[in-house]
């Protein structure tokens, strides 16, 4: 029994000195495993006389249970300490203010496109689209633009070959629409266009929205009234608007439209005109029966004027300090 007391004391001491779960598990195997001293003592009962065997067995069980209880308590202590350490490491100061969630916003160019298309869709104009890689027929020929026109030159247009180019305007959408639809036609064509130019007010890629209206009674007076209403709604001001005679191969008569700026100067905002009879003939519409008007506007130009932006290139530099102003 002296040996039993010694084993029990050693087990209790080892358990008390265990610093983590791994060390405690090693002690469990050492003292309570199949080859441990408590197991050996129980196996040694066969050498004890039958009369003394019950009492000796009881003492061994009591000692083993004492050590087992100590081991269980130590295990709880270590697990609790480990949990507390983990909680302390991960604790959150609930008195701190929460972090603000950054939400995205629409790009100012997208906002302008949405604003323009919403206005005209309420007047019955539907959105049409077309390819950005266009043929010279749809980009130039069908629009009454002659072969010698400077817009066809390499310094203005990105050509793939003599017949394919990056479209310089969304007017090709008008031609494709008139080929497949019969008047009355009332469409708008927003999209990307490309020109070989880059400075403070020009970029190689920009956005354009064109309008086309074809009907038997389409006239310039109706066009002027439509654009007056649009510009005042877009800028949310009762602006002064003027129409200046101009020249576009695909419209006749043609005009450029200006608005009076806050600095007292006229600012050009878009071009327009009555669809040229040759353009109508090119798509099989009789110009003696139908007339039409077309409008072309640069989205970035409108956006710059609405939000007082001085450099068009800022729209494409992905500077969050700039873009956050429009959220």
Swiss-Prot record:
Binds 2 magnesium ions per tetramer. InterPro entries: aa-tRNA-synth_II, aa-tRNA-synth_II/BPL/LPL, Phe-tRNA-synth_IIc_asu, Phe-tRNA_ligase_II_N, Phe_tRNA_ligase_alpha1_bac, Phenylalanyl-tRNA_Synthase, tRNA-bd_arm. GO terms for cellular component: cytoplasm. It is found in: Cytoplasm. The keyword ATP-binding applies. One of its GO terms (molecular function) is phenylalanine-tRNA ligase activity. GO terms for biological process: phenylalanyl-tRNA aminoacylation. This is Phenylalanine--tRNA ligase alpha subunit. It comes from Pasteurella multocida (strain Pm70). The gene is pheS.
């Amino acid at each position: 029994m002296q040996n039993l007391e010694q084993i029990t004391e050693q087990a209790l001491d080892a358990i008390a000195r265990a610093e983590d779960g791994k060390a405690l598990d090693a002690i469990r195997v050492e003292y309570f495993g199949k080859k441990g001293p408590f197991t050996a003592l129980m196996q040694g009962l066969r050498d004890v006389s039958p009369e003394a065997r019950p009492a000796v067995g009881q003492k061994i069980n009591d000692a083993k249970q004492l050590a087992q209880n100590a081991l269980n308590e130590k295990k709880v202590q270590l697990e609790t300490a480990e949990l507390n350490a983990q909680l302390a490491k991960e604790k959150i100061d609930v008195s701190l203010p929460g972090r603000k969630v950054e939400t995205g916003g629409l790009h100012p160019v997208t906002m302008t496109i949405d604003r323009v298309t919403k206005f005209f869709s309420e007047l019955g104009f539907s959105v049409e689209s077309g390819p950005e890689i266009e043929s010279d027929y749809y980009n130039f020929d069908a629009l009454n633009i002659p072969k010698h026109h400077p817009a066809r030159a390499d310094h203005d247009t990105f050509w793939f070959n003599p017949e394919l180019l990056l479209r310089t305007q969304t007017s090709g959408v008008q031609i494709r629409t008139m080929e497949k639809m019969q008047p009355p036609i009332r469409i708008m064509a927003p999209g990307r266009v490309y020109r070989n130019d880059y400075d403070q007010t020009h970029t190689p890629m920009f956005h354009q929205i064109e309008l086309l209206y074809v009907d038997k009674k389409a006239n310039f007076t109706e066009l002027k009234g439509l654009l007056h209403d649009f510009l005042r709604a877009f800028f949310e001001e009762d602006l002064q608007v003027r129409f200046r005679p101009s020249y576009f191969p695909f419209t006749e008569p043609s005009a450029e439209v200006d608005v009076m700026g806050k600095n007292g100067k006229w600012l050009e905002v878009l071009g327009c005109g009555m669809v040229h009879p040759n353009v109508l003939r090119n798509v099989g519409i009789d110009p003696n029966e139908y007339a039409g008007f077309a409008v072309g506007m640069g989205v970035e130009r409108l956006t710059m004027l609405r939000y007082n932006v001085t450099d068009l290139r800022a729209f494409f530099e992905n500077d969050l300090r700039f873009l956050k102003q429009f959220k």
